[in-house]
Amino acid sequence: LLGHLNGEVQRFVPRFNPEVNGWWMCDYGRFLAEGFNDREVDVPLRRSEGRTRKVTWHGALETIAGMMRVTANPLVVASANLSNEALFCIKRNLVDAEGLDVVVPVHRGEVRRIKNAHGQWIESADAHPNSNGARLMGLPVVDVANLESYLRDGDGPLLVLDAHAHPWLATADAAAAVAQRSTAVLARTATPLVESASVVLPGASWAETEGTYTSSEGIVQHARRALPPTGQSQPAWQVVYALARHLGHEQERHVSPRVLFAEMAAETAAFAGMTYGRLMSEPGMPIHGEVDRVG
C-alpha cells in the first residue's frame, strides 16, 4: 500500500496477502518511497537546432512515428518495470504489427532475499517488478552488455519507453552511445539521455498507473492507481496505444488496462482464463506454465 498526502508519496506499507507475503515487506521496498515524488518532466518536449520547446502529445507522437517511418532500423528499449498491459501493447503493436526490434533490459544487482507467506526465503538478483511479464510476452530480455551493444551497434532512431529501465541508461555513456541519432524517451526525471533526446515524453509513475504485474514466482497481481498522473504525464500502455494509432495499427476505440488484459488473456497462453475482475478481488492468480526465476 502507498501512503500519500496532498499528492505526495509519504511511505510504503505492506498489503496483507496470505498467499504471497503475509504482512511482510522488505526494507528495500519500504525505502523506495524516497525520491518517488521527483518529477522533472511534466509536458512533452521537442528539441531541434539547439532549442527546446513544449509540444502537444499529438505533435510529439507524430514526430516519433515520422522518425520510425522515414529511417531504417528503428530500435526500441522497453522495460521490465512496466505493467503486463503495457508490455502486451508493445509486443502486439511495435513488434508484431510494426516489425520493430525491441529489447527489455534487466538489471541483475546484488542478490536480495525476501520471505514468502510460507516462511520460505526467496532469493533473486532481478531488481524489476515484471521481468517475467516481459518473458511471457515473448519479448527478449537482455543484460547490460547486450543492452550496450544493442545501442552502440544500431544506426536507426531510438525509442526508450522508460528512462530508468536499467541503471546504465541513466549514465552519460548511454547518451553518448546514441548521440548521433534521433531519440525519444519516456521519463519522469532528467538524465543525460533525457537531456539530449530529440523528443521527451512525460511518463506516469507506477503509482499513477493501474495494471497487473507477474512476480518472480509466477503470480499475477493487480495494482490500483494511487494517484492521478502529474501534469500531462501518461502511463506507458496509453503512450504505446496512441503511437500505434499514429503508425496506423490501431483504430480509435475505448482502451483501458481492463480491455488490454482481456485481449492479452485471449492471445497469450500464460494468462488464459484469467479475468481482470477476479484479479481486482483476489490476492493473485498463478500463470499457466513455468516461470524463469532469476537468481
Regions found by a protein language model. Give the residues of each.
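Broad hydrophobic/π-residue packing in well-ordered secondary structure
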Residues: W24, F31-G35, R53-W57, V77, ...
